[in-house]
Amino acid sequence: MWRFAVFLAAFFVQDVVGSHGDPELHMTTPQIIERWGYPAMIYTVATDDGYILEMHRIPFGKTNVTWPNGKRPVVFMQHGLLCASSDWVVNLPDQSAGFLFADAGFDVWLGNMRGNTYSMKHKDLKPSHSAFWDWSWDEMATYDLNAMINHVLEVTGQDSVYYMGHSQGTLTMFSHLSKDDGSFAKKIKKFFALAPIGSVKHIKGFLSFFANYFSLEFDGWFDIFGAGEFLPNNWAMKLAAKDICGGLKVEADLCDNVLFLIAGPESDQWNQTRVPVYATHDPAGTSTQNIVHWMQMVHHGGVPAYDWGTKTNKKKYGQANPPEYDFTAIKGTKIYLYWSDADWLADTPDVPDYLLTRLNPAIVAQNNHLPDYNHLDFTWGLRAPDDIYRPAIKLCTDDYLGK
């Protein structure tokens, strides 16, 4: 049902922009990679709690780049909320982070968190089982990152990776590092945080609308959004779309796509011929529990673990309220921040007033405040290659060469 709804949204969007018949509408991430003449490889890894995650790899690019030690540096890219590995390759090769890093000589790995298009398997559970969806970004931070990064290091023989995360891909890394004893941090040479997430108290859009529409004690979230895989009921979508998009000059069908309702539908830096491809591959799925966790964060104003309710919290956490992730405890990994006032999700004032006040200045290598980036522009925007990807490539290259 969810994929059918996304297909309809993509069909209407492509009618608007006049881009009929793009083969990438029906391709997987590896197929998109191969379409542009790059090698693509697929790997799977099991998490400690049984989920089977699929990763996509571009082992090398079209250029003949050699390294002194004979090993290519590894960059691991982690998608954001409701997204997938495709985010890093859905623009043209000279516009997509995955291809640009590959052509610069990097071994590129693209992760997929549990519950998205590519990570829908479990050792014992099926997606039709409600227990399959009993998780939020807590478990992604605890299990998924560990499993994927460790597998990448095992396959490549490297002892560390360069990490580029977007949106939820930054939240999970921040959260994992905040509980790390130092053993994981040493595996992350540099952390490029695109649209970084700490507090989301002041966000706009879909999540803010529903979080503020109902009280924190409201217990009908799963009735509204459906149990298991996240799919808002039609009335809920229409209610949110009317409130959020009523005053914006956007195509109705584009606004009906829940991803744009969450992240912000207006952008002046998308390749418009690619919009149907964006809308076909995203949203890529997550659990309703994960969406509820995000809305709990809106109410909380910080970064709490999932709130199961007082009784279960006491069993799970040993206290009535969920504990908060302590970002002041992060150490050992250099972080490069990229954020914008125009972002609905990694917004102002949450980034400067919450995230930056908690990260130790000693680990914040760069704080890049970019003008006019919405939440999705960090992966799809046409200015991102010059503003983010190429500078990041140079930083990683110089670091790997010991400059």
UniProtKB/Swiss-Prot annotation:
First and last residue of the signal peptide: 1-18
Induction text: Up-regulated by fasting.
Entry-listed glycosylation sites: N64, N271
Naturally occurring in which organism (per UniProt): Caenorhabditis elegans
PROSITE patterns: LIPASE_SER
EC number: 3.1.1.-
Subcellular location: Lysosome lumen; Secreted
Record-given protein name: Lipase lipl-5
